[in-house]
Amino acid sequence: MRDTPPALIRAALVGVSGYGRWHLLMAMEQALVGRLQFVGATVINQAEEAVICDRLRRQGVPVFGCFDEMLAALAGRVDLVLLPTGIQWHAPMTVAALAAGAHVLVEKPIAATLQEVDRIIAAQAAAQRLVAVGFQDLYVPAAHDIKRRVLAGERGTLRRVTVRAQWPRPEGYFSRNTWAGRLRTDGAWVLDSPVNNAFAHFLMLALFWAGAQPETAAEVVQLEAELYRAHVIESFDTVSLRARTADAVEILFYGSHAGCEERPPEIRITGDRGEITWIYEKAYTISRAGASLEEFAVPSQLDTRLSVLESLVARLRGEPAFIVGPELARAHTRMMNALHELFPINVIGQEHIEVAQETDGIFRRIRHLDSSLAEAARRNALFSETDAPWAIAGDAQSLDGYESFARCCPPSISVG
């Protein structure tokens, strides 16, 4: 960093709705313990958020209607900008905040494309500022204890990391903002999907735990993926993928917003002498030959989210703390870009879909998805390698030399 910010970090926030609520909570938590001063907020929907805006103003925090206006008004008086914004704004706002001399906490994913990530990396180097990315599960000690155990070979040579995530979402989930379920919005790539949004944390954990060094992610050299769409959206809502890393570790991912069963995301780390099983908000278990040896708690969602800004503020105050930087987060964006560029989105036929009106809204569900997903995860298979009638096999693709998004996506294909 170019210089050290004052002991009291002066922070500004962009957005207080949606995920912005969590960033507001994080900032207020750090302010309460005397480590952060809230100096400004950009809120474009001030009428809708009148209560929060009034509260901020009463606390002496100026509220702006425009991001650029806020940066200009706070020039030289802000150390950190929090960006819980839409994916399409991550890169331009991060670069602008860095140019204004501020450090940045940007929500995950870091950006939609590799080119944008590389712009952020270059801007960070020029500004000599920090950029932290909100992959919250990597900020807690549990993630690093697991990484230490993997690198130490406690369960033998690492063979496979398997992620299973099932969170059904109603139609309203995809209409909650201008970018949900979209490939492009506001003239920019967004590439929204389960693995670039709700499940991004868990794919990032898999890449991190498969990485060869304590603070690096795995390099994926080959990818095979099946993308499916049951909802009326541009992107996909269901996925199975198989990746191979440069160290010959297999990464498997199974996820959907279009099933019946809701279950906490689970990551299974398999070595040739045992496993580590991590379950979201519950525990991680160290086992050998199916017998549990040790079990440790996984922090709650609240504690995990609060740890992000806590870690960044500590780092800015010169204290040792881990943060997810752009170079680490880039591994996730690289996989997202390869998925969209190299594999088609298969549109599930209506004969394979059930539509149900429930208390939380209208749900579109792929028939027998839950059993197919469970079978695939059990057998380390893709959906097309089960008896799922809607599944379509694809070819494995090399990612050798894949370092930029070519700005074109394979067409959607209807599944009979």
Language model: regions and residue ranges:
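Predominantly a Rossmann-like dinucleotide-binding segment in NAD(P)-dependent oxidoreductases
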Residues: 138-223, 229-232
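Beta-strand-loop-alpha-helix segment that lines the small-molecule cofactor/substrate pocket
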Residues: 80, 86-87, 91-138, 153
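Glycine- and charged-residue-rich phosphate/anionic-cofactor binding loop of Rossmann-like
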Residues: 36-39, 294, 318-331
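Short amphipathic alpha-helix with an adjacent loop that forms part of the alpha/beta core around
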Residues: 67-76
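N-terminal Rossmann-like dinucleotide-binding module
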Residues: 1-59
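Short, Asp-centered acidic motifs that coordinate Mg2+ and/or phosphate
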Residues: 40, 80, 160
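Contiguous beta-strand/loop segments that form the cofactor/metal-binding neighborhood of enzyme cores
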Residues: 197-322, 336-341, 350-416
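Short acidic-hydrophobic, aromatic-tinged amphipathic segments that line or gate anion-handling sites
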Residues: 62-66
